[in-house]
């Protein structure tokens, strides 16, 4: 079901859709590289999760990056268990459209992924990204430990200063533990590989994101 006007405030536990106990069916293998979306992942590899607007274009930005082993799109940082795409788009689940990134830290650092994240979209737009408006398009970095959070906060501070110098407003990116990651439907996985001419609303600010020496290798 779609609502004619999307709310721009997050739902409460009382107003959120109830969801379902079972996971939504999705693809088993990555459409581009045939690696397993849900694992097992190689020993020593790490995961990162980002939200930067419509996940179709966001996922492609990461799977094209050297050192990234597999990507998947899904929903997180919300309230409704096992939501569908239609439910997320209603604004009544509280989720973002996120990208799970599995990467080799010997090839690319977490800080470099955060840099790519910031440069790939406009993180100052609140509950929208370009023409895409709604709570599911908000910017987010979903960290799994204190070290990731510290790196994300440090890179955010550096980029916020760079953006301010170019006339942009404050960064609205949330940096939190996003809770469960619910894999999106098969149709959405690697969408722009399956549909090369498909919609991609991803667009950055044109401002380079600096990384301090202290966090560059993390």
Curated annotation (Swiss-Prot):
Keyword match Transferase: no
Catalyses which reaction(s): L-methionyl-[protein] + [thioredoxin]-disulfide + H2O = L-methionyl-(S)-S-oxide-[protein] + [thioredoxin]-dithiol; [thioredoxin]-disulfide + L-methionine + H2O = L-methionine (S)-S-oxide + [thioredoxin]-dithiol
Q: What NCBIfam families does the record point to?
A: msrA
A cellular component term (GO) from this record? cytoplasm
Q: Where is the active site?
A: 54
A Gene Ontology BP annotation from the UniProt entry:
protein modification process
Which keywords are on file for this protein? Answer: Oxidoreductase
Q: Cite the PANTHER family for this sequence.
A: MITOCHONDRIAL PEPTIDE METHIONINE SULFOXIDE REDUCTASE
**Native organism:** Azorhizobium caulinodans (strain ATCC 43989 / DSM 5975 / JCM 20966 / LMG 6465 / NBRC 14845 / NCIMB 13405 / ORS 571)
Enzyme Commission number(s) of this protein = 1.8.4.11
Q: At the top level of its lineage, which domain of life is listed?
A: Bacteria
Answer whether the UniProt record assigns the keyword Nuclease to this protein: no
SUPFAM superfamilies, from UniProt?
Peptide methionine sulfoxide reductase (SSF55068)
Q: Which family does it belong to?
A: Belongs to the MsrA Met sulfoxide reductase family.
Q: What is this protein called?
A: Peptide methionine sulfoxide reductase MsrA
Q: What molecular function does GO assign, one term?
A: peptide-methionine (S)-S-oxide reductase activity
Q: What does this protein do?
A: Has an important function as a repair enzyme for proteins that have been inactivated by oxidation. Catalyzes the reversible oxidation-reduction of methionine sulfoxide in proteins to methionine.
